[in-house]
Amino acid sequence: MGLPWYRVHTVVLNDPGRLLSVHIMHTALVAGWAGSMALYELAVFDPSDPVLDPMWRQGMFVIPFMTRLGITNSWGGWSITGGTTTNPGIWSYEGVAGAHIMFSGLCFLAAIWHWVYWDLEIFCDERTGKPSLDLPKIFGIHLFLAGVACFGFGAFHVTGLYGPGIWVSDPYGLTGKVQSVNPSWGVEGFDPFVPGGIASHHIAAGTLGILAGLFHLSVRPPQRLYKGLRMGNIETVLSSSIAAVFFAAFVVAGTMWYGSATTPIELFGPTRYQWDQGYFQQEIYRRVSAGLAENQSLSEVWSKIPEKLAFYDYIGNNPAKGGLFRAGSMDNGDGIAVGWLGHPIFRDKEGRELFVRRMPTFFETFPVVLVDGDGIVRADVPFRRAESKYSVEQVGVTVEFYGGELNGVSYSDPVTVKKYARRAQLGEIFELDRATLKSDGVFRSSPRGWFTFGHASFALLFFFGHIWHGARTLFRDVFAGIDPDLDAQVEFGAFQKLGDPTTRRQAV
């Protein structure tokens, strides 16, 4: 046929059977990828430390999505929460992966069948005997079925009425587990961080979809609208479908990057804004202040800070710290976190407590500056010793650790103090194993960053695809030179402009 690569899809333009076939094959590829990727991730995933080496630090991409829908156990005998399990059954990570691969195989066979048996009676118009699809009716059927699935997910799966529920956690990502969720029908249901909104919105949207589907099945579009929106043209379907997909892609890119109840930090890692706003740091200080108010010692209050909470307050877990072309998981960057060293408290020789100014997200290097409680600079690590007034040596800065592995240990040696001051720029200080994975020490992004980048990029691409195909279908007559209302038989090649009798070719 000799079609250029960008026009090959014209082979299914007026062939409903093979159009169905290629879509089934596409579903086979998507489901096959999902199942295969899940098996690969399960092969390389280490579930031994859910606190310091969670799935998002290891670069898992599909495991978090399975987990948020209620899958927590593996045939390997482990649970995502760190415990063990004996009989996970079919609804395990491997079971879901296998189901996707089996479904992919069935779709593959169905695609071949529909490619071979493309000329089915169901695709033919009874009046003309030519292949034809009743697109408004198909739209109604699909809308109805999508509404049923949406309603079922919200009313049964999420609520736990017939299903496991979804992953729900506290605002600081410490107590997450799979549980049933009651729908939130009040104004709180519109809060993107309230899990009840997921149930209520799916129930509401599903109900609307069912009603809209029944409407489109029972009411035919007016002729003017049918012609104006080219409802008989399959490219109209392509254009509007692309619109639905790019809109959804933009929405999920936003909910992933900015965070929501659908993207828990235990599964996808914290957001960059939690570092920017000192979100976890504030909670840690709140707990410390509450402990001190109860006359507990600094050592006691810092020892009660959960290691998980301290680990979130570390810049290496900020998804915006990854760079372009830095492939690999976070563990391949700064290493595998082994343990929390504790919270360093710096003091000058006057006994003032000093705080290290933290590195902003988009800096690779940042001056080491120590300020007092009033924000006045008291010490730094100078760039030029000759100009220094506030160097660690001159000011006599010491550091003492509270909580963690170095609890109660103090240092006054300037070299050691400066080392920990530099590390305190990056948040809480952790011991990191860079040898095991040959980690290069350069920060990587988390799956939160990859998902956002991928979906935002494809959404932009699909936006242009929507404009392109929408324009093609709306202005097809202009582009082709054929009046869509032309009833006369047109002889191709008789006119210089197709269908225009004033441009009849003259025999030479």
Swiss-Prot record:
Principal subcellular localisation of the protein: plastid
One GO term describing the cellular component: photosystem II
Note accompanying the cofactor annotation: Binds multiple chlorophylls. PSII binds additional chlorophylls, carotenoids and specific lipids.
MF (Gene Ontology): chlorophyll binding; electron transporter, transferring electrons within the cyclic electron transport pathway of photosynthesis activity
Location of this chain's protein in the cell: Plastid, Chloroplast thylakoid membrane
Keywords annotated in UniProt: Chlorophyll, Chloroplast, Chromophore, Membrane, Photosynthesis, Photosystem II, Plastid, Thylakoid, Transmembrane, Transmembrane helix
TM annotation in the entry: 21-36, 101-115, 140-156, 203-218, 237-252, 457-472
Keyword RNA-binding in record: no
Cited InterPro entries: PS_antenna-like (IPR000932), PS_II_antenna-like_sf (IPR036001), PSII_PsbB (IPR017486)
Keyword Plastid carried by entry: yes
Record-level GO BP terms: photosynthetic electron transport in photosystem II
Record function comment: One of the components of the core complex of photosystem II (PSII). It binds chlorophyll and helps catalyze the primary light-induced photochemical processes of PSII. PSII is a light-driven water:plastoquinone oxidoreductase, using light energy to abstract electrons from H(2)O, generating O(2) and a proton gradient subsequently used for ATP formation.
Recorded family membership: Belongs to the PsbB/PsbC family. PsbB subfamily.
Subunit structure: PSII is composed of 1 copy each of membrane proteins PsbA, PsbB, PsbC, PsbD, PsbE, PsbF, PsbH, PsbI, PsbJ, PsbK, PsbL, PsbM, PsbT, PsbX, PsbY, PsbZ, Psb30/Ycf12, at least 3 peripheral proteins of the oxygen-evolving complex and a large number of cofactors. It forms dimeric complexes.
NCBIfam families: PS_II_CP47
Entry protein name: Photosystem II CP47 reaction center protein
